[in-house]
Amino acid sequence: MLLNIAVICLAACVGALMRWGFALWLNPGGLIPWGTLAVNLIGGYCIGIALAVFTSRPDIDPAWRLLVITGFLGTLTTFSSFSGEVVTMLMQQRFGLAFGTIALHLGGSLALTWAGMRSALWWLAR
């Protein structure tokens, strides 16, 4: 149990720092918070790969799933920042921008999760 906690904490630290780095790099001054979108899309693709690999390879130690999905990707991606940014847009009556942002995050994340799964399954079948 202690090893699982350590694995999650270590990976969560890396994911959170990467998310912060993307926000510092891409969010300032833009029409939409590009850093938040980037981490959610990258995370969507990566979780698709991870889910396909872990499902196809049940022999992989479960600690790896905790490290990759729960720790790293769980903190790299952010639903809370996305929600806060969209609600702020709505409160500013920037409705088109808010709904466009919702479409980009949800549609993009779902599409890239699917693409990540398909990519990994293709690679594993080779």
From Swiss-Prot:
The keyword Aminoacyl-tRNA synthetase does not apply. GO terms for biological process: cellular detoxification of fluoride. Keywords: Cell inner membrane, Cell membrane, Ion channel, Ion transport, Membrane, Metal-binding, Sodium, Transmembrane, Transmembrane helix, Transport. Fluoride-specific ion channel. Important for reducing fluoride concentration in the cell, thus reducing its toxicity. It catalyses: fluoride(in) = fluoride(out). Na(+) is not transported, but it plays an essential structural role and its presence is essential for fluoride channel function. Belongs to the fluoride channel Fluc/FEX (TC 1.A.43) family. The gene is fluC. It is a multi-pass membrane protein. It comes from the Bacteria. One of its GO terms (cellular component) is plasma membrane. Its main location: membrane. InterPro entries: FluC (IPR003691). Pfam families: CRCB. It comes from Paracidovorax citrulli (strain AAC00-1). One of its GO terms (molecular function) is metal ion binding. Na(+) binds at residues 74, 77. It is found in: Cell inner membrane. This is Fluoride-specific ion channel FluC. The chain crosses the membrane at residues 5-25, 34-54, 67-87, 95-115.
